[in-house]
Protein backbone atom coordinates (compact mmCIF):
# COMPACT_ATOMS: atom_id res chain seq x y z
CA UNK A 1 0.00 0.00 0.00
CA UNK A 2 1.49 3.34 -1.08
CA UNK A 3 1.42 6.48 1.05
CA UNK A 4 0.14 8.62 -1.82
CA UNK A 5 -2.87 7.89 -4.03
CA UNK A 6 -1.29 6.66 -7.30
CA UNK A 7 -4.57 6.96 -9.20
CA UNK A 8 -4.66 10.73 -8.64
CA UNK A 9 -2.63 13.04 -10.90
CA UNK A 10 -0.67 15.71 -9.05
CA UNK A 11 -2.71 18.46 -10.71
CA UNK A 12 -5.60 18.48 -13.15
CA UNK A 13 -8.62 20.52 -14.12
CA UNK A 14 -11.35 20.67 -11.51
CA UNK A 15 -14.00 17.96 -11.60
CA UNK A 16 -17.63 18.93 -11.14
CA UNK A 17 -18.53 15.92 -8.97
CA UNK A 18 -17.89 17.35 -5.50
CA UNK A 19 -18.34 15.81 -2.07
CA UNK A 20 -20.66 17.20 0.58
CA UNK A 21 -17.82 18.97 2.39
CA UNK A 22 -16.74 20.61 -0.86
CA UNK A 23 -20.24 21.74 -1.81
CA UNK A 24 -20.60 23.56 1.52
CA UNK A 25 -20.21 27.27 0.75
CA UNK A 26 -19.40 26.65 -2.93
CA UNK A 27 -18.90 29.86 -4.91
CA UNK A 28 -19.69 29.88 -8.63
CA UNK A 29 -18.54 32.73 -10.87
CA UNK A 30 -19.57 33.41 -14.43
CA UNK A 31 -18.68 36.61 -16.23
CA UNK A 32 -19.94 37.16 -19.73
CA UNK A 33 -20.71 39.85 -22.25
CA UNK A 34 -23.74 38.86 -24.29
CA UNK A 35 -23.18 35.27 -25.36
CA UNK A 36 -19.42 35.49 -24.89
CA UNK A 37 -18.17 34.01 -21.61
CA UNK A 38 -15.16 35.84 -20.19
CA UNK A 39 -14.68 33.55 -17.22
CA UNK A 40 -16.49 30.63 -15.64
CA UNK A 41 -15.38 28.72 -12.59
CA UNK A 42 -16.23 27.48 -9.14
CA UNK A 43 -14.42 27.70 -5.83
CA UNK A 44 -14.87 25.52 -2.79
CA UNK A 45 -14.21 27.03 0.61
CA UNK A 46 -10.70 25.57 0.47
CA UNK A 47 -10.18 27.30 -2.88
CA UNK A 48 -11.54 30.51 -1.38
CA UNK A 49 -9.00 30.21 1.42
CA UNK A 50 -6.18 29.96 -1.10
CA UNK A 51 -7.51 33.03 -2.92
CA UNK A 52 -7.80 34.95 0.35
CA UNK A 53 -4.21 34.16 1.35
CA UNK A 54 -3.07 34.92 -2.19
CA UNK A 55 -4.51 38.43 -1.93
CA UNK A 56 -3.06 38.87 1.57
CA UNK A 57 0.46 37.80 0.60
CA UNK A 58 0.40 39.83 -2.61
CA UNK A 59 -0.78 42.88 -0.68
CA UNK A 60 1.92 42.50 1.96
CA UNK A 61 4.96 41.82 -0.21
CA UNK A 62 4.06 44.05 -3.15
CA UNK A 63 3.47 46.94 -0.73
CA UNK A 64 6.87 46.33 0.86
CA UNK A 65 8.52 46.31 -2.59
CA UNK A 66 6.88 49.27 -4.29
CA UNK A 67 5.56 51.69 -1.66
CA UNK A 68 8.07 53.82 0.29
CA UNK A 69 6.11 53.89 3.54
CA UNK A 70 7.41 53.52 7.08
CA UNK A 71 8.16 50.11 8.56
CA UNK A 72 5.85 50.91 11.46
CA UNK A 73 2.88 51.48 9.16
CA UNK A 74 3.76 48.38 7.19
CA UNK A 75 3.90 46.32 10.38
CA UNK A 76 0.41 47.50 11.31
CA UNK A 77 -0.84 46.76 7.78
CA UNK A 78 0.80 43.31 7.71
CA UNK A 79 -0.55 42.45 11.15
CA UNK A 80 -4.07 43.44 10.14
CA UNK A 81 -3.97 41.49 6.88
CA UNK A 82 -2.43 38.42 8.53
CA UNK A 83 -5.06 38.37 11.28
CA UNK A 84 -7.82 38.77 8.69
CA UNK A 85 -6.34 35.93 6.65
CA UNK A 86 -6.00 33.66 9.68
CA UNK A 87 -9.55 34.33 10.86
CA UNK A 88 -10.93 33.87 7.35
CA UNK A 89 -9.02 30.62 6.97
CA UNK A 90 -10.51 29.26 10.19
CA UNK A 91 -14.07 30.19 9.20
CA UNK A 92 -13.80 28.85 5.66
CA UNK A 93 -12.01 25.57 6.36
CA UNK A 94 -13.35 24.43 9.74
CA UNK A 95 -16.11 22.15 8.41
CA UNK A 96 -13.90 20.65 5.70
CA UNK A 97 -10.96 19.81 7.98
CA UNK A 98 -13.28 18.28 10.57
CA UNK A 99 -14.92 16.02 7.98
CA UNK A 100 -11.51 15.05 6.57
CA UNK A 101 -10.14 14.58 10.12
CA UNK A 102 -7.22 16.95 9.60
CA UNK A 103 -8.11 19.75 12.00
CA UNK A 104 -4.50 19.71 13.16
CA UNK A 105 -3.45 21.12 9.77
CA UNK A 106 -5.61 24.19 10.39
CA UNK A 107 -4.11 24.62 13.85
CA UNK A 108 -0.63 24.20 12.39
CA UNK A 109 -1.16 26.96 9.82
CA UNK A 110 -2.67 29.27 12.43
CA UNK A 111 0.33 28.76 14.74
CA UNK A 112 2.78 29.34 11.89
CA UNK A 113 1.06 32.55 10.79
CA UNK A 114 0.87 33.95 14.32
CA UNK A 115 4.51 33.00 14.90
CA UNK A 116 5.52 34.81 11.73
CA UNK A 117 3.43 37.81 12.72
CA UNK A 118 5.02 38.05 16.18
CA UNK A 119 8.56 37.70 14.82
CA UNK A 120 7.88 40.28 12.10
CA UNK A 121 6.46 42.81 14.55
CA UNK A 122 9.32 42.24 16.99
CA UNK A 123 11.85 42.76 14.21
CA UNK A 124 10.31 46.16 13.51
CA UNK A 125 9.17 47.45 16.89
CA UNK A 126 11.93 45.86 19.00
CA UNK A 127 14.68 46.46 16.48
CA UNK A 128 15.58 42.85 15.78
CA UNK A 129 17.75 43.70 12.79
CA UNK A 130 18.78 40.13 12.04
CA UNK A 131 15.16 39.09 11.61
CA UNK A 132 14.21 42.26 9.74
CA UNK A 133 16.85 41.57 7.10
CA UNK A 134 15.48 38.08 6.52
CA UNK A 135 11.70 38.55 6.59
CA UNK A 136 11.30 36.98 3.16
CA UNK A 137 13.35 33.97 4.27
CA UNK A 138 11.23 33.73 7.40
CA UNK A 139 7.89 33.68 5.61
CA UNK A 140 9.04 31.32 2.88
CA UNK A 141 10.35 28.97 5.56
CA UNK A 142 7.17 29.08 7.64
CA UNK A 143 5.05 28.52 4.53
CA UNK A 144 7.25 25.57 3.55
CA UNK A 145 6.63 23.98 6.96
CA UNK A 146 2.89 24.51 6.53
CA UNK A 147 2.88 22.94 3.08
CA UNK A 148 4.91 19.96 4.30
CA UNK A 149 2.41 19.39 7.12
CA UNK A 150 -0.50 19.71 4.68
CA UNK A 151 1.15 17.34 2.22
CA UNK A 152 1.71 14.70 4.89
CA UNK A 153 -1.76 15.12 6.40
CA UNK A 154 -3.57 14.89 3.07
CA UNK A 155 -1.00 12.56 1.48
CA UNK A 156 -0.64 15.08 -1.31
CA UNK A 157 2.39 15.29 -3.56
CA UNK A 158 1.62 18.79 -4.83
CA UNK A 159 1.71 20.32 -1.35
CA UNK A 160 5.08 18.68 -0.69
CA UNK A 161 6.38 19.97 -4.04
CA UNK A 162 5.16 23.48 -3.26
CA UNK A 163 6.80 23.24 0.15
CA UNK A 164 10.08 22.34 -1.55
CA UNK A 165 9.61 25.23 -3.98
CA UNK A 166 9.31 27.66 -1.06
CA UNK A 167 12.26 26.10 0.74
CA UNK A 168 14.60 26.10 -2.26
CA UNK A 169 13.60 29.68 -3.10
CA UNK A 170 15.20 30.98 0.10
CA UNK A 171 18.86 30.76 -1.03
CA UNK A 172 17.89 32.15 -4.44
CA UNK A 173 16.76 35.43 -2.87
CA UNK A 174 20.39 36.52 -2.58
CA UNK A 175 20.51 36.74 -6.39
CA UNK A 176 17.49 39.07 -6.52
CA UNK A 177 18.19 41.04 -3.35
CA UNK A 178 16.75 44.36 -4.63
CA UNK A 179 13.56 42.54 -5.62
CA UNK A 180 13.28 39.97 -2.85
CA UNK A 181 9.88 41.16 -1.63
CA UNK A 182 8.44 41.07 -5.13
CA UNK A 183 9.96 37.64 -5.75
CA UNK A 184 8.62 36.28 -2.48
CA UNK A 185 5.17 37.68 -3.19
CA UNK A 186 5.10 36.13 -6.66
CA UNK A 187 6.17 32.71 -5.34
CA UNK A 188 3.73 32.64 -2.44
CA UNK A 189 0.73 34.21 -4.19
CA UNK A 190 1.40 32.30 -7.41
CA UNK A 191 1.36 28.92 -5.66
CA UNK A 192 -1.85 29.84 -3.84
CA UNK A 193 -3.51 30.91 -7.09
CA UNK A 194 -2.44 27.63 -8.71
CA UNK A 195 -4.00 25.61 -5.87
CA UNK A 196 -7.25 27.58 -6.10
CA UNK A 197 -7.65 27.12 -9.85
CA UNK A 198 -6.77 23.43 -10.24
CA UNK A 199 -7.68 20.16 -8.53
CA UNK A 200 -4.82 18.72 -6.50
CA UNK A 201 -4.13 15.18 -5.39
CA UNK A 202 -4.92 13.83 -1.93
CA UNK A 203 -5.67 10.53 -0.24
CA UNK A 204 -8.87 8.62 -0.94
CA UNK A 205 -12.06 9.94 0.73
CA UNK A 206 -12.90 8.69 4.21
CA UNK A 207 -16.17 8.23 6.07
CA UNK A 208 -16.84 10.46 9.04
CA UNK A 209 -19.49 10.22 11.74
CA UNK A 210 -20.16 13.93 11.23
CA UNK A 211 -21.93 13.02 8.00
CA UNK A 212 -25.28 11.29 7.78
CA UNK A 213 -25.64 7.98 5.96
CA UNK A 214 -27.24 9.82 3.05
CA UNK A 215 -24.29 12.20 2.84
CA UNK A 216 -21.81 9.32 2.99
CA UNK A 217 -23.63 7.54 0.19
CA UNK A 218 -23.68 10.77 -1.82
CA UNK A 219 -19.91 11.07 -1.42
CA UNK A 220 -19.42 7.47 -2.56
CA UNK A 221 -21.47 8.11 -5.69
CA UNK A 222 -19.54 11.31 -6.39
CA UNK A 223 -16.26 9.41 -6.01
CA UNK A 224 -17.43 6.80 -8.51
CA UNK A 225 -18.46 9.54 -10.92
CA UNK A 226 -15.06 11.23 -10.60
CA UNK A 227 -13.29 7.94 -11.29
CA UNK A 228 -15.51 7.28 -14.30
CA UNK A 229 -14.92 10.78 -15.66
CA UNK A 230 -11.17 10.41 -15.20
CA UNK A 231 -11.19 7.03 -16.97
CA UNK A 232 -13.19 8.33 -19.92
CA UNK A 233 -10.91 11.34 -20.16
CA UNK A 234 -7.80 9.21 -20.68
Describe every region a protein language model picked out:
Residues 1-46, 229-233:
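N-terminal juxtamembrane cytosolic/stromal segments of multi-pass membrane proteins
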Residues 102-163:
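Membrane-proximal helix-loop-helix units in multi-pass membrane proteins
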Residues 35-117:
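Selected alpha-helical membrane-embedding segments in polytopic membrane proteins
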Residues 56-60, 85-88, 143-146, 169, ...:
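Membrane-embedded alpha-helical transmembrane segments of multi-pass integral membrane proteins
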Residues 65-78, 125-135, 175-184:
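Membrane-helix interface and helix-disruption motif detector
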Residues 146-230:
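Terminal transmembrane helical module of multi-pass membrane proteins
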Residues 52, 135-142, 184-187:
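Physicochemical signature of membrane-embedded alpha-helices that form the seven-helix bundle of GPCRs
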Residues 58-65, 115-126, 146-148, 166-178:
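Hydrophobic alpha-helical transmembrane segments and adjacent interfacial helices
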